[in-house]
Design a protein with these regions (language model features):
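N-terminal glycine-rich anion-binding loops that anchor highly charged ligand groups
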Residues: 22
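Short, well-ordered amphipathic alpha-helical segments that serve as non-catalytic structural scaffolds
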Residues: 29-30, 89
Length: 151
């Protein structure tokens, strides 16, 4: 696995300042939630930091990355390219950043679209992405408060 400091530096260069700041906030929110629910804080931090690592890529770059790693998108992802960065982010995390923990990879992969049977880590990243402190939309406070009731 790539050293955390190097990973952080790389992300700060490839992501916009706003996206990088969002990723940092997600990682901190994820750590806070992991502490609440007994989930590994290191995995929560890493998944939160990396979750949007492919967000800067164009559609064509994401398609090319998937082909390079022989990955096939499901129909929903192809129909909604705005969520494609989650699958590609998991590929980058695995093949370019050296993450081999399937729990972290799945938390990245499913941070945009929930699935049946999500792990606690997956739920944490899914919620932290929506509820981190920079987010400002109708209903965000309700999401933040609902965390106290459990995952």
């Amino acid at each position: 696995m790539m050293d955390i400091a190097l990973l952080d530096e790389k992300l700060s260069k490839v992501l916009s300042e706003k996206r990088y700041t969002h990723s940092v906030y997600v990682s901190h929110t994820a750590v806070d939630m992991a502490k609440m629910f007994g989930v590994d804080i290191n995995k929560a931090f890493l998944a939160g930091l990396i979750h949007d690592c492919a967000k800067y890529m164009s559609y064509d770059e994401m398609i090319d990355t998937a082909k390079r790693y022989e990955y096939t998108f499901d129909g929903m992802t192809l129909a909604c390219p705005g969520i494609m960065h989650a699958d590609v982010g998991a590929l980058l995390a695995q093949y370019e950043y050296g993450i081999d923990d399937t729990g972290i990879l799945d938390a990245i992969r499913y941070h945009t679209v929930a699935r049946v049977g999500m792990t606690s880590l997956e739920k944490i990243i899914y919620i932290a992405d929506m509820a981190e402190p920079m987010r400002d939309f109708d209903g965000v406070e309700k999401i933040r408060k609902s965390v106290d009731g459990g995952l």
